[in-house]
Amino acid sequence: MAKMSKQARAREFNAASRQIIKERDLYQCIFCRMEYHMEDVSWYGQQLQSIMHYIPRSRGGLGIPQNGALGCQSHHEMLDNGNKGRREEMLQIFKQYLQDHYPDWSEEALTYSKWKQCIYKFVYTKRRNYESTN
């Protein structure tokens, strides 16, 4: 199996992030909980759940809780495909949901940047070293 690049790893939700998202979202699709267009949701589609990216991986969206929410297969497909003409409305609902949970939420912080990662690693390492010496 080929090793994933740092960028590819950063865009995937790891086990810890997935667990945080599931607990935050009460193990339910965020759109099903608000009964969003349930006429287009099948029982089977509700049973299959996955983590949805607000900013997609294809646009550098990170695999962090601030960029994800739990979605059933039906709503996830509705969001990704936009075939019902509801994508923009769903993105607004998704954005508001994330802002409600993370007061300092911003779209800029949700995308991968090699330089952001370097700065974060530098600051985190310095802080960790400082805390371990004091």
Locate each region found by the language model:
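A boundary/linker detector
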Residues: 1-26, 33-45, 88-134
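Histidine-centered nuclease catalytic patch
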Residues: 31-70, 85-90
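Zinc-coordinating Cys/His ligand positions in small cysteine/histidine-rich zinc-finger domains
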Residues: 71-75
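Active-site hotspot residues in diverse enzymes, especially metal/ion-binding acidic/histidine motifs
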Residues: 80
